[in-house]
Amino acid sequence: MKHMIQNKQLTTSEKQKAKSEKRKTKNEKRRRDSIIPIKLYNTATKKKQILKPYRANTIRMFVCGPTVYDYAHIGHARTYIAYDMFVRFLRMAGYTVAYIQNITDIDDKIITRAREQKMIPKDLARKFEKEYRADMKNLLVISISRYVRATSKIKEIISQVKRLLEKKYAYFTPDGIYYDVSRFQDYGKLAGRTALSAEDSITRIDESVQKRNKGDFCLWKSAKPQEPKWKSPWGWGRPGWHIEDTAISEHFFGPQYEIHGGAVDLIFPHHQAEIAQMEALSGRKPMVQIWMHTGFLRIGKEKMSKSLGNFTTIRDAMRTVPAHVLRLFIASTLYRSPILFHESMIQQARENWETINSMYNTIRLMHARIAHNTNAKREISRIQQYQKQFRAMLADGFNTPRALAIVFTYIKFIQSLGQSLSQETRAAALEFFTDIDTVFGILQKQKLSAIPRTITNLVAKREQFRNNKQWQQADAVRKQIERAGYCVEDTPSGSRLRKK
C-alpha cells in the first residue's frame, strides 16, 4: 500500500511537470512558427542573402561603437538609431538577439584631446562615454544588450596578439607589434581593395617607418611617456584600434557569429583588419555571416564628421528636433544609403510624424462602436494585409522607407472608412500601430481625455463629404469641429485631428 501511495504521489508530480513541459513545448513551437525569415544585404558578397542563425533563432550582433573623445554628432545618431530599429525588428520577428556595442576608450584621439584639455585620458573617456550613453537614451535607443569598454578586455587583447605572433601573422618593430597583411590572402576583399592600396583609405592606418607593408596595422603599441599603458609579455604598452573589437567579439561570441555592423567608412581598413585578425586566429571562415554598413549622413556634398568640422552634436540637434521626429527622418531612407541632413527633410519628417502619431491617438482615444458591424471582417482583413506587407518590407533588406509607405497607405485606408470603428477593427488597427512603434519607436501618447464621439463622428462625416467632393459641406463640418475646440488639418497623407 505504501509503495502504491508513493507511486500515486510521484505520478501526480510527474503529471504537473509534464503539463508544464507541454506548455513550454507549445509556446516554443508557436514562437518557432512565428519566426519571420529575413534577407539582408551583405557588404562582403554585395548581394542580399537569408540570415541563418548558427544557434536556434538566436542572433549575435556586434556594432562598432564610438571613440569617446568628444560629444556624439547626428552622423552617429543615424548609425545607432538605424541599428536600434533593426534589432527591435529582429526581436519582433521572433529572434533572441544579443547585441553588443564596444566603447573605444583608449585611442590616439583620446590621448591627444586629453592633452589639449589637460585631463587624464581615462577621465576624458569616462566623461564622454557618459555623455554618449545619455544621448542614446534621449534618442530612445533601447536595444543594446551590453556596452563593452576596450580597456575591460586587455587580457583578451594580449591573448590575441600573442597567438597572432605564434602563427607568424604578426611581427615586432621598435614602436610595437604589427599585423603583416601580406600573410592574409583575402586582405582587402571586403572593400574590393588590395593590401597595396591601403594608404588610400580615409580612415585610421598606423604610420611607422619600420613596417613591412604600407597596409600593416598596429596590434600593440609600445609605451610612450605620459600615455596610458598596460603590462604585457613584450613590455608596457597599449592596444591598437582594430584588435580591441575582435578581442571583445571573440570573448562574447566566439570566432564566428551572425552580424557585424558599423558605418560605411569602417569597411576599410577597420572591418577588413578585424576579419584578417579573427580568421587568422581561428582558421574558420567567415568570421561574420553578414556585414551591415550604414551610409553617410551628409551636409551638402560632404559627409558629416568631426575631422571635417561640419558636425552638429546630437544634443544640439535635439534642442529643435524631438527624438521621435529624428528617428522617423532616419527611417525614411534605406539604412545603407546616404542621407541628406537638411531643414526641408526634417520638416517633412515632422509633418509625417504628426500624421502617424495623430492617427494613432485618434484611434486610441476614440469611442469604438460596441456592436459588431458587417464590414468589420473585411476591414480587419485589410488592416492585417497592410501589417503583413509592413513586416515583409522590413524582412526584405530592412527596407524602412517602403515599410513607411505601407504605413501611410494604411492610414489613408483607416480614414476612408468614413465612420467610427467597431471594437474589432479598432483593436486590429492598434495592433498594427504597436508593430510600427515596436520597430521605429516613434509614437507618443497624447495626454488628453478621450476624443468625444461627437467629434470623431464629425471628422468621419467630413471625410465622407471630401471623398464625394462635396467641398462646401465638408467646410461647414470643419467649422463645427473648430467651434468644439479641435483642429482638423489636411495633408498629402490624410487628415489630422488635434486639440486647439
Predicted regions, residues:
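Short, glycine/charge-rich beta-strand/loop segments that flank catalytic centers
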Residues: 103-107, 129-132, 142-157, 175-184
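N-terminal, positively charged nucleic-acid-binding surface of large information/translation enzymes
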Residues: 35, 45, 54-140, 494-497
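Structural preference for alpha-helix termini/caps and helix-kink/transition segments
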Residues: 303, 310-500
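Short, basic, low-complexity termini and linkers enriched in Ser/Thr/Gly/Pro
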Residues: 2-34, 378
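The substrate-binding groove and active-site-proximal loops of carbohydrate-active enzymes
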Residues: 114-121, 145-151, 263
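Short phosphate-binding/catalytic loops that engage adenosine nucleotides
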Residues: 95, 169, 486
